[in-house]
């Protein structure tokens, strides 16, 4: 079965979020189980630098101007690149300029991505024709509208990585992107008087997936649906919206092979974890105290990620003699808030503003607890990394966090199902109480070790997700 993944990011070449991690691993896992999966991406500078050896597949002019379609390989997976420098030849973030202004021609840049995706199902490459087009997030959402307009020459799947980003543009652009005006309708592309690329993906695809079962349920409610609850609940009722959990790329995120950490370890030999903890404490200039419960947080600093909840409850960590290390950047007032915490408690709390891939790995390997107190979280990857590394996740019960972490209660510990700590209300008080429970378990080393073992034995491999996607494709 020939699968074309239409997307806008690819780890490690170009990443703004978890979407890149998914595309960096899923097609490879699918090929390992016998599918024939390829990518389609815009030829951004970061992508072409990483994939220098390509051949021309097609050359044409359309609504977006002159375009060359190239083909190459990356990590053993075939990849098509849309070479249109006037649209994609921009350094840095693929969606906005250095001042965080969205590019004014994004409607055309991502319409072209969708258009080429549909053409690859109708013979644009005479040697390979997609049988299933799998579009990811709003950037690729128009792809399934173009497929629909062509009489659906291939089956289609649309994956929602984050519903908050909808790709909305003026309906005036419809004339410029080669779609009939009849598609601009509430039963089509229209959302709040604009074209919604995300709604296009949902409405016209044969099936949509969310990146966890709980998130698939949550987005049918007004609180999470951003005005799309009617469409989404209808899709769910028809069996056209399902949740499939993301996986962990074990070539990159496994404590026994991780290239970024100084001391490897595995379930049967955990000595390296203690050594990584000491290295992490030294990096952040905190006391190298093995007995201090070390909390880590690697995140975008936004309210969505619950950073404000942590700021208001972090004194609990200090009071109990724990340590807190934070890596991330984001909203200026939250950056300032965590800086002030570190200044107030220099023996217990340390912060690095920015992003550092190597440090993020050391934090996951060296921490005892990884904090993910999100208000909403479609899937979440950091809690999965925590499970893999025996760094117990402390999470809020939402989205993929609810699907992947089992709270440590006396019953669940005894049943050997506990894998972390879970709280429900998005309040500082609820988070504070959960922190207290983590400290209580830390005082029972044997119980802590049991939970850590059960966490590390969880299977969130990409092979498992690849099998679930294959089952979905086969029933379309």
From Swiss-Prot:
| GO terms for MF | alpha-1,4-glucan glucosyltransferase (ADP-glucose donor) activity; alpha-1,4-glucan glucosyltransferase (UDP-glucose donor) activity
- Which keywords, in A-to-Z order, does the entry hold? Glycogen biosynthesis, Glycosyltransferase, Transferase
Reactions catalysed, semicolon-separated, are: [(1->4)-alpha-D-glucosyl](n) + ADP-alpha-D-glucose = [(1->4)-alpha-D-glucosyl](n+1) + ADP + H(+)
Q: Which domain of life is it from?
A: Bacteria
Q: What Enzyme Commission number(s) appear in the record?
A: 2.4.1.21
Q: Describe which pathway this protein belongs to, using the record's wording.
A: Glycan biosynthesis; glycogen biosynthesis
GO cellular component annotations of the record: cytosol
Q: Which GO terms describe its biological process?
A: glycogen biosynthetic process
Q: Which Pfam families match?
A: Glyco_transf_5, Glycos_transf_1
Annotated positions binding ADP-alpha-D-glucose = 15
Q: Which SUPFAM superfamilies match?
A: UDP-Glycosyltransferase/glycogen phosphorylase (SSF53756)
The disulfide bridges present are none
Q: What does the UniProt record say this protein does?
A: Synthesizes alpha-1,4-glucan chains using ADP-glucose.
Q: To which protein family does this belong?
A: Belongs to the glycosyltransferase 1 family. Bacterial/plant glycogen synthase subfamily.
The protein's name: Glycogen synthase
The organism named in the record is Haemophilus influenzae (strain ATCC 51907 / DSM 11121 / KW20 / Rd)
């Amino acid at each position: 079965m020939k699968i074309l993944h239409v997307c806008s990011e690819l780890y490690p070449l170009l990443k703004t979020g978890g979407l890149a991690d998914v595309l960096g691993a899923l097609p490879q896992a699918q090929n390992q189980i016998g599918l024939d999966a390829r990518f389609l991406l815009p030829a951004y500078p970061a992508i072409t630098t990483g994939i220098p050896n390509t051949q021309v597949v097609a050359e044409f002019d359309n609504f977006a101007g002159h375009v060359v379609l190239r083909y190459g390989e990356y990590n053993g997976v075939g990849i098509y690149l849309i070479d249109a420098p006037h649209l994609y030849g921009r350094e840095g973030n693929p969606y906005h300029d250095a001042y965080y202004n969205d590019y004014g021609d994004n409607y055309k840049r991502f319409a072209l991505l969708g258009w080429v995706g549909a053409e690859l199902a109708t013979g644009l490459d005479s040697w390979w024709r997609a049988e299933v087009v799998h579009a990811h997030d709003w950037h690729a959402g128009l792809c399934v509208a173009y497929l629909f307009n062509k009489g659906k020459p291939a089956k289609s799947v649309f994956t929602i990585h984050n519903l908050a980003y909808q790709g909305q543009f003026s309906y005036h652009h419809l004339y410029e992107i080669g779609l009939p005006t009849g598609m601009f309708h509430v039963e089509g592309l229209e959302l709040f008087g604009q074209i919604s690329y995300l709604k296009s993906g949902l409405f016209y695809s044969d099936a949509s997936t969310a990146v966890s079962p709980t998130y698939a349920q949550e987005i049918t409610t007004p609180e999470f649906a951003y005005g799309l609850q009617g469409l989404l609940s209808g899709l769910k009722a028809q069996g056209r919206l399902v949740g499939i959990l993301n996986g962990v790329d074990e070539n990159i995120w496994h404590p026994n092979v991780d290239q970024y950490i100084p001391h490897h370890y595995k379930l049967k030999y955990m000595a390296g974890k203690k050594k990584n903890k000491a290295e992490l404490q030294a990096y952040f200039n905190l006391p190298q105290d093995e007995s201090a419960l070390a909390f880590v947080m690697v995140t975008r600093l936004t309210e969505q990620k619950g950073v404000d909840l942590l700021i208001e409850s972090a004194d609990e960590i200090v009071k109990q003699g724990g340590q807190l290390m934070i890596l991330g950047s984001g909203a200026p007032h939250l950056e300032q808030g965590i800086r002030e915490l570190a200044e107030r408690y220099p023996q217990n709390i340390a912060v690095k503003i920015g992003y550092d891939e190597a440090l993020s790995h050391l934090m996951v390997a060296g921490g005892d607890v990884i904090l993910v107190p999100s208000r909403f979280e479609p899937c979440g990857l950091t809690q999965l990394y925590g499970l893999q590394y025996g760094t117990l996740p402390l999470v809020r019960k939402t989205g993929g966090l609810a699907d992947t972490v089992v709270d440590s209660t006396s019953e669940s510990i005894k049943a050997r199902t506990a894998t972390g700590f879970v709280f429900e209300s998005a309040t500082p008080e609820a988070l504070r109480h959960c922190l207290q429970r983590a400290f209580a378990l830390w005082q029972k080393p044997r119980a802590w070790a049991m939970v850590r073992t059960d966490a590390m034995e969880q299977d969130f491999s990409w092979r498992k997700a690849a099998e679930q996607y294959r089952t979905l494709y086969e029933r379309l």
